[in-house]
Amino acid sequence: MEWSDVFHEITTRHDFAAMHDFLEKEYTTEIVYPDRKNIYQAFDLTPFEQVKVVILGQDPYHGPNQAHGLAFSVQPDAKFPPSLRNMYKELQDDVGCIRKSPHLQDWAREGVLLLNTVLTVRQGEAHSHKNIGWETFTDEVIQAVSEHLTHVVFILWGKPAQQKIKLIDTSKHHIIQSPHPSPLSAYRGFFGSKPYSQANTYLQANGKQPVNWCESEV
Protein backbone atom coordinates (compact mmCIF):
# COMPACT_ATOMS: atom_id res chain seq x y z
CA MET A 1 0.00 0.00 0.00
CA GLU A 2 1.23 3.50 -0.81
CA TRP A 3 0.23 6.98 0.30
CA SER A 4 -1.54 7.45 -3.03
CA ASP A 5 -3.87 4.59 -2.08
CA VAL A 6 -4.49 6.16 1.33
CA PHE A 7 -5.21 9.55 -0.20
CA HIS A 8 -7.58 7.96 -2.70
CA GLU A 9 -9.51 6.33 0.14
CA ILE A 10 -9.68 9.63 2.03
CA THR A 11 -10.85 11.69 -0.93
CA THR A 12 -13.60 9.22 -1.76
CA ARG A 13 -14.99 9.74 1.76
CA HIS A 14 -14.51 13.50 2.07
CA ASP A 15 -14.82 16.51 -0.21
CA PHE A 16 -11.86 18.87 0.15
CA ALA A 17 -12.93 21.26 -2.62
CA ALA A 18 -13.60 24.13 -0.20
CA MET A 19 -10.20 23.68 1.43
CA HIS A 20 -8.53 23.53 -1.97
CA ASP A 21 -10.22 26.78 -3.04
CA PHE A 22 -9.29 28.46 0.25
CA LEU A 23 -5.64 27.45 -0.14
CA GLU A 24 -5.54 28.60 -3.76
CA LYS A 25 -6.65 32.05 -2.63
CA GLU A 26 -4.33 32.10 0.40
CA TYR A 27 -1.24 31.15 -1.59
CA THR A 28 -2.12 33.77 -4.20
CA THR A 29 -2.87 36.68 -1.85
CA GLU A 30 -0.94 35.94 1.37
CA ILE A 31 2.42 34.57 2.48
CA VAL A 32 1.74 30.96 3.49
CA TYR A 33 4.07 28.30 4.87
CA PRO A 34 5.41 25.89 3.89
CA ASP A 35 6.04 26.44 0.18
CA ARG A 36 3.39 24.68 -1.86
CA LYS A 37 5.86 22.07 -3.05
CA ASN A 38 6.59 21.06 0.55
CA ILE A 39 3.06 20.72 1.96
CA TYR A 40 3.18 16.94 1.67
CA GLN A 41 6.90 16.44 2.29
CA ALA A 42 6.30 14.20 5.31
CA PHE A 43 4.64 11.70 2.97
CA ASP A 44 7.25 12.13 0.22
CA LEU A 45 10.12 11.29 2.57
CA THR A 46 8.45 8.50 4.56
CA PRO A 47 6.74 5.88 2.36
CA PHE A 48 3.59 4.41 3.90
CA GLU A 49 4.88 0.87 4.35
CA GLN A 50 8.05 2.18 6.02
CA VAL A 51 6.30 4.15 8.80
CA LYS A 52 7.64 2.94 12.16
CA VAL A 53 7.06 6.00 14.33
CA VAL A 54 4.54 8.84 14.13
CA ILE A 55 5.33 12.12 15.91
CA LEU A 56 2.38 14.50 15.91
CA GLY A 57 2.72 18.27 15.80
CA GLN A 58 0.05 20.95 15.47
CA ASP A 59 0.51 23.50 12.69
CA PRO A 60 3.68 24.56 10.84
CA TYR A 61 6.08 27.20 12.10
CA HIS A 62 4.83 30.56 10.85
CA GLY A 63 8.11 32.47 10.47
CA PRO A 64 10.24 32.86 7.33
CA ASN A 65 12.70 30.10 6.39
CA GLN A 66 11.32 27.64 8.94
CA ALA A 67 8.54 25.26 7.89
CA HIS A 68 9.27 22.76 5.13
CA GLY A 69 6.60 20.11 5.65
CA LEU A 70 7.97 18.09 8.59
CA ALA A 71 6.57 18.61 12.09
CA PHE A 72 9.07 20.20 14.53
CA SER A 73 11.75 20.45 11.82
CA VAL A 74 13.08 23.68 10.32
CA GLN A 75 15.26 24.37 7.31
CA PRO A 76 18.99 23.73 7.82
CA ASP A 77 20.07 27.37 8.20
CA ALA A 78 17.18 28.43 10.45
CA LYS A 79 17.46 29.16 14.16
CA PHE A 80 16.51 26.36 16.53
CA PRO A 81 12.89 26.68 17.72
CA PRO A 82 12.60 26.25 21.51
CA SER A 83 10.60 23.00 21.30
CA LEU A 84 13.16 21.40 18.99
CA ARG A 85 15.99 22.51 21.26
CA ASN A 86 14.26 20.73 24.15
CA MET A 87 13.68 17.64 22.00
CA TYR A 88 17.41 17.52 21.33
CA LYS A 89 18.24 18.03 25.01
CA GLU A 90 16.08 15.02 25.89
CA LEU A 91 17.62 13.08 22.99
CA GLN A 92 21.11 13.69 24.40
CA ASP A 93 20.02 12.66 27.89
CA ASP A 94 18.11 9.64 26.56
CA VAL A 95 20.38 8.06 23.95
CA GLY A 96 23.54 10.14 24.24
CA CYS A 97 23.76 11.78 20.83
CA ILE A 98 24.13 15.47 20.02
CA ARG A 99 22.38 16.78 16.92
CA LYS A 100 23.62 20.02 15.39
CA SER A 101 21.16 20.51 12.54
CA PRO A 102 17.55 21.60 13.13
CA HIS A 103 16.55 19.69 9.97
CA LEU A 104 14.86 16.32 10.60
CA GLN A 105 14.91 14.92 7.08
CA ASP A 106 17.06 11.98 8.20
CA TRP A 107 14.43 11.00 10.79
CA ALA A 108 11.80 11.04 8.06
CA ARG A 109 13.94 8.75 5.91
CA GLU A 110 14.33 6.43 8.91
CA GLY A 111 10.56 5.85 8.98
CA VAL A 112 9.50 8.62 11.35
CA LEU A 113 6.34 10.30 10.05
CA LEU A 114 6.62 13.89 11.29
CA LEU A 115 2.98 14.85 10.89
CA ASN A 116 1.40 18.17 11.74
CA THR A 117 -2.36 17.92 12.18
CA VAL A 118 -2.70 21.13 10.12
CA LEU A 119 -0.35 21.31 7.14
CA THR A 120 -0.36 25.03 6.26
CA VAL A 121 -0.33 28.38 8.05
CA ARG A 122 -0.36 32.07 7.18
CA GLN A 123 2.83 33.99 7.99
CA GLY A 124 2.86 35.29 11.54
CA GLU A 125 -0.57 33.88 12.38
CA ALA A 126 -0.48 30.64 14.36
CA HIS A 127 -3.52 28.41 13.82
CA SER A 128 -4.74 30.61 10.94
CA HIS A 129 -5.57 27.51 8.87
CA LYS A 130 -7.26 25.65 11.70
CA ASN A 131 -10.64 24.11 10.83
CA ILE A 132 -10.36 24.52 7.06
CA GLY A 133 -10.26 20.74 6.57
CA TRP A 134 -6.74 19.64 7.41
CA GLU A 135 -7.78 18.01 10.67
CA THR A 136 -10.20 15.74 8.82
CA PHE A 137 -7.45 14.78 6.39
CA THR A 138 -4.78 14.09 9.01
CA ASP A 139 -7.20 12.21 11.29
CA GLU A 140 -7.81 9.90 8.36
CA VAL A 141 -4.06 9.53 7.84
CA ILE A 142 -3.62 8.50 11.48
CA GLN A 143 -6.47 6.01 11.18
CA ALA A 144 -5.00 4.56 7.98
CA VAL A 145 -1.64 4.00 9.64
CA SER A 146 -3.41 2.39 12.59
CA GLU A 147 -5.59 0.18 10.41
CA HIS A 148 -3.15 -0.99 7.74
CA LEU A 149 0.16 -1.21 9.63
CA THR A 150 1.26 -2.98 12.81
CA HIS A 151 3.63 -2.17 15.67
CA VAL A 152 3.91 1.55 14.98
CA VAL A 153 4.98 3.86 17.81
CA PHE A 154 2.82 6.97 18.17
CA ILE A 155 4.59 9.74 20.11
CA LEU A 156 2.00 12.17 21.43
CA TRP A 157 3.30 15.29 23.18
CA GLY A 158 0.73 17.56 24.83
CA LYS A 159 -3.03 17.41 25.08
CA PRO A 160 -3.96 18.21 21.45
CA ALA A 161 -1.85 15.28 20.24
CA GLN A 162 -3.12 13.00 23.00
CA GLN A 163 -6.70 13.60 21.88
CA LYS A 164 -5.82 11.52 18.81
CA ILE A 165 -5.45 8.32 20.87
CA LYS A 166 -9.07 7.51 20.04
CA LEU A 167 -8.03 7.10 16.38
CA ILE A 168 -5.37 4.49 17.17
CA ASP A 169 -5.80 0.76 17.77
CA THR A 170 -3.75 0.43 20.95
CA SER A 171 -3.91 -3.37 20.81
CA LYS A 172 -1.42 -3.43 17.93
CA HIS A 173 0.45 -0.15 18.29
CA HIS A 174 2.42 1.54 21.07
CA ILE A 175 1.59 4.97 22.51
CA ILE A 176 4.22 7.18 24.15
CA GLN A 177 2.80 10.31 25.71
CA SER A 178 4.15 13.11 27.84
CA PRO A 179 3.85 16.88 28.18
CA HIS A 180 4.90 18.92 25.14
CA PRO A 181 8.59 19.84 24.69
CA SER A 182 7.77 23.57 24.58
CA PRO A 183 9.43 25.70 27.29
CA LEU A 184 6.02 26.09 28.95
CA SER A 185 5.69 22.39 29.71
CA ALA A 186 9.00 20.60 29.14
CA TYR A 187 9.85 20.56 32.85
CA ARG A 188 6.46 19.08 33.74
CA GLY A 189 7.38 15.62 32.52
CA PHE A 190 8.81 15.84 29.00
CA PHE A 191 12.37 15.88 30.29
CA GLY A 192 13.19 12.41 31.53
CA SER A 193 10.42 10.72 29.54
CA LYS A 194 12.94 8.92 27.25
CA PRO A 195 10.68 8.70 24.17
CA TYR A 196 13.47 7.82 21.76
CA SER A 197 14.83 4.80 23.60
CA GLN A 198 11.29 3.71 24.50
CA ALA A 199 10.35 3.73 20.82
CA ASN A 200 13.39 1.68 19.82
CA THR A 201 12.85 -0.85 22.61
CA TYR A 202 9.31 -1.47 21.33
CA LEU A 203 10.38 -1.64 17.67
CA GLN A 204 13.15 -4.13 18.37
CA ALA A 205 10.87 -6.25 20.57
CA ASN A 206 8.55 -6.52 17.57
CA GLY A 207 11.17 -7.42 14.99
CA LYS A 208 11.74 -3.97 13.51
CA GLN A 209 14.93 -2.01 13.01
CA PRO A 210 15.41 0.74 15.59
CA VAL A 211 15.43 4.37 14.49
CA ASN A 212 18.82 6.06 14.23
CA TRP A 213 17.89 9.24 16.10
CA CYS A 214 21.45 10.57 15.89
CA GLU A 215 22.59 12.84 13.10
CA SER A 216 23.21 11.16 9.77
CA GLU A 217 24.02 12.39 6.30
CA VAL A 218 21.10 12.20 3.86
Curated annotation (Swiss-Prot):
Sorted alphabetically, which keywords does the UniProt record give?
Answer: Cytoplasm, DNA damage, DNA repair, Hydrolase
Q: Which GO terms describe its biological process?
A: base-excision repair, AP site formation via deaminated base removal
Single GO cellular component annotation?
A: cytoplasm
Q: Which domain of life is it from?
A: Bacteria
| Keyword Transcription part of the UniProt annotation | no
EC primary class: hydrolase
Which InterPro entries does this UniProt record tie to the protein? UDG_fam1, Ura-DNA_Glyclase_AS, Uracil-DNA_glycosylase-like, Uracil-DNA_glycosylase-like_sf
Q: Where in the cell is it found?
A: Cytoplasm
Which Pfam families does its entry note? UDG
Name the Enzyme Commission number(s) assigned to this protein.
Answer: 3.2.2.27
What role does it play? Excises uracil residues from the DNA which can arise as a result of misincorporation of dUMP residues by DNA polymerase or due to deamination of cytosine.
Q: Which HAMAP family match?
A: UDG (MF_00148)
Homology family: Belongs to the uracil-DNA glycosylase (UDG) superfamily. UNG family.
Name-wise, this protein is Uracil-DNA glycosylase
Tell me the organism: Staphylococcus saprophyticus subsp. saprophyticus (strain ATCC 15305 / DSM 20229 / NCIMB 8711 / NCTC 7292 / S-41)
